[in-house]
Structure formats: C-alpha cells, structure tokens
C-alpha cells in the first residue's frame, strides 16, 4: 500500500488578509467537515482553521466527503482556538460566530473583508470562550418551524450570505 505525506498546514499568520476564512469549533464528524471543505472550495474560502485535537483526521471518510477539496482549501491546525481567533482579530479579520441565539441575523450584520465565519459543533454550538472571542455572534434566520441546520448546511448558507454581501460571487 502506498503512503503519502500529509498535506502541509499553513500558519495562521500567513493567511491572506482578504476573502473568507472558516473557523471550526470542535466539529468532529468527518462527513460534516468533508462537506464543509467541499463548500469552502466552491466559495473560494482562503483556509479552514480548526483545532489539532477534537477534529477528524484528513483521511478516509473526510477526504471522500470533501470530493477533492482537501487539495484546494488549506487546513490550518491550531492548538488553541481562542488564541487563533485573537490572532485573526489582531490581523484585521472580522470574526463572526454563528449561533441560533446570535443577536442579529447574518444578512443584517455589516460584513467586511477579511471575514472569518466561526461555526460550532452540532449540539454544543460555539464554546463560551469562542463566543466571547468573536467580534460578533450572528444567527441564520429561517422561516420554518425548525430554526437550526446541520452544521455543513449552515456553513454553505453562511458562505453564500457572506460571499454575496462582500461581492465575491462570480469572481
């Protein structure tokens, strides 16, 4: 069986200060992370930031779910997500956490580049320190009885809203 080297993980300080970055707060399901990667590639996301622990390995199920996106969207593995968010804030990123209890609908939040959209694990959502480190916490308003989505579906909806509002569609 042939073995391959893992894809390199860039440093958070080398991320382009433009476009959109996704930040994943302890999303452990490889199907969800793979689907998020695939959507991220479709929306030209610059990178996905996630913790080295409490995230699935970039192999097997995740790679299959990502449909080739692992080679297109850099994964930035960090030890401490709150510190990574602080670094993004210091580098000029607008960090927007997504939570059903957010104060404003994402479509009403004044967005700018560079933008970091922060998604929490299903069930638990964003951890408290993650929420506190985000510049703002927004929600995705929906007209139906169910007010929350699977995290991979929430990611694609947030990416669409963000990319549309920032004028990144069709670039």
Segments from the language model and where they lie:
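Post-transcriptional modification and biogenesis factors for structured RNAs
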Residues: 1-171
